[in-house]
Amino acid sequence: MRLYRDWALVLRQHNLGEADRIVTLLTRDHGLVRAVAKGVRRTRSKFGARLEPFAYIDAQLHPGRNLDIVTQVVSIDAFATDIVSDYGRYTCGCAMLETAERLAGEERAPAPTLHRLTVSALRAVADGNRPRDLLLDAYLLRAMGIAGWAPALTACARCATPGPHRAFHIAAGGSVCVHCRPAGSTTPPRGVLELMSALHDGDWGTAQQAPQSHRSYASGLVAAHLQWHLERQLKTLPLVERTHQAYQVDRSIAERRAALVRQDMACG
């Protein structure tokens, strides 16, 4: 089969044998691709650090039966350096990479919108001009939108009655009106759902004015909504959540998420 080229974001890697690695790539035109980088762990490897997580590359690959083979790599963007040099940025970026891999779907299924969103979000994290927690929640909300899982925030998830509505129920699909509100719904403080809507829509002026208590509550709802749809917990989110401890909120995001998930499991 013929060689092909594609722009790719390195999501993760793991060792293969004594000198090789398998890399997982989110490509612009071919979706999720897993490929072998031969000799990458050798000191004089031609790939260097260009196949580390967060690297954004122009890759040439040879199609294989189970795994493709990386034959050439050219760096496109150097934002990886700014991300891995700071723990907060690194953990935020790791959560984005894990989410991208979970939402990309089957291998080789084109996911250009998710690819573009993820690269843009990582660039924003590297720039450091906006709060990391807001960037992560905005990314998760928009990524869920691409997957068809975005929570209803401005209308009732069940009857589509325009909001705003006070209650939120993950299994129902987001905000719910007083008539559709299931048992076990949570009632976020006023302004939390508006913050989530601002993050989804890119209204950074509104989002950055939200108090930290609202931002923490919104993070819990976003994480719970995503993981309910994934039917599994993201391994990287607890690491990100530890960075919020300095704000001394009354309850940790992890506790809120666990409580919300238990409510939805109990209430269907």
UniProtKB/Swiss-Prot annotation:
Domain of life: Bacteria
GO annotations of cellular component type: bacterial nucleoid
GO biological process, one term: double-strand break repair
InterPro entries from the UniProt entry: ARFGAP/RecO (IPR037278), DNA_rep/recomb_RecO_N (IPR022572), NA-bd_OB-fold (IPR012340), RecO (IPR003717), RecO_C (IPR042242)
The entry's keywords: DNA damage, DNA recombination, DNA repair
Function description: Involved in DNA repair and RecF pathway recombination.
PANTHER family (alphabetical): DNA REPAIR PROTEIN RECO
Protein family per UniProt: Belongs to the RecO family.
This protein's name: DNA repair protein RecO
